[in-house]
């Protein structure tokens, strides 16, 4: 689609992706980390470049598509480079499952955990990812966030929260989400209604503006639920 023009900060953005890389993905300097995403996408910015490199880890970058010349390519790369943390999107997991459901068994690699990002992952796809790709051992870190947020907002955390197929888990530390309906009424747990996810507090990774269009930035992201347009207090 058309680029949004999200303008991120420098220090705050780096601090947030470094923090989530360390505390959510548990990346350490000795790890070989592979985020199998497009480097031109926010996931590539945050979790191919800035996050793992800020942790002094080795970050794998590859060219081409995962299933060419054959669907065993990702697992060969993982085996050859001793990748121990894997990160990809449900769309890619579905593609790999369809193209070569038994391919992971052919290769000797070991992931301690695997991240999923970008969209919901169906429980049956999640189970294949865990059983076949993760060999029944790797923890799945199921995340929710978007371009505007800079890094993870919700996620299961390795060893701290139980995995649930198809669920991205609770808010990460420092993030306080709430669900509002169209009239700014809060929808509590069990409300049985759809609403809009809002974050009640600022955080270092949140984007600063839309490039060249601050009015659209305010109208799109803040005006709907703003209690006092003249206030300078973020709580309003």
Language model features: what each stretch is:
Residues 50, 57, 84-88, 97-165, ...:
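Gly/Ser/Thr-rich phosphate-binding loop
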Residues 117, 154-156, 169, 189-192, ...:
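Active-site glycine/GP-rich loop and adjacent strand/helix microenvironment
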Residues 178-201, 206:
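Conserved beta-loop-beta connector loops within the AMP-binding
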Residues 1, 38, 118, 145, ...:
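Active-site glycine-centered loops adjacent to acidic/histidine catalytic or metal-binding residues
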Residues 198-236:
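Conserved ATP-binding/catalytic segment of the ANL
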Residues 162-171, 188, 224-236:
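Short Gly/Pro-enriched turn/cap motifs at secondary-structure boundaries
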Residues 11-32, 42-84, 99-101:
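Conserved AMP-binding/adenylation subdomain of ANL enzymes
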Residues 1-15:
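Conserved AMP-binding A3 loop
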């Amino acid at each position: 689609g058309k680029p949004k023009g999200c303008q991120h900060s420098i220090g705050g953005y780096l601090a947030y992706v470094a923090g989530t890389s360390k505390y959510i993905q548990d990346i350490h300097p000795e790890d070989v980390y592979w985020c199998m995403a497009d480097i031109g996408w926010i996931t590539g910015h945050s979790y191919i470049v800035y996050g793992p490199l800020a942790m002094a880890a080795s970050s794998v970058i590859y060219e081409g598509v995962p299933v060419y010349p054959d669907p065993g390519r990702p697992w060969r790369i993982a085996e050859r480079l001793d990748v121990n943390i894997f990160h990809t999107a449900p769309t890619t997991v579905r593609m790999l499952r369809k193209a070569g459901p038994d391919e992971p068994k052919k290769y000797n690699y070991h992931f301690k955990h695997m991240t999923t990002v970008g969209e919901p992952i169906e429980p049956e796809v999640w189970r294949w990812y865990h059983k076949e790709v993760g060999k029944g051992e790797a923890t799945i870190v199921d995340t929710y966030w978007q371009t505007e947020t800079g890094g993870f907002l919700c996620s299961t955390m390795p060893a701290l929260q139980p995995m649930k197929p198809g669920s991205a888990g609770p808010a990460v530390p420092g993030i306080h989400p709430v669900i509002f309906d169209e009239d700014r009424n809060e929808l509590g747990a069990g409300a049985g209604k759809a609403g809009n996810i809002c974050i009640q507090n600022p955080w270092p990774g949140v984007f600063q503006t839309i490039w060249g269009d601050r009015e659209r930035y305010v109208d799109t992201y803040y005006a709907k639920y703003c209690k006092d347009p003249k206030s300078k207090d973020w709580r309003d």
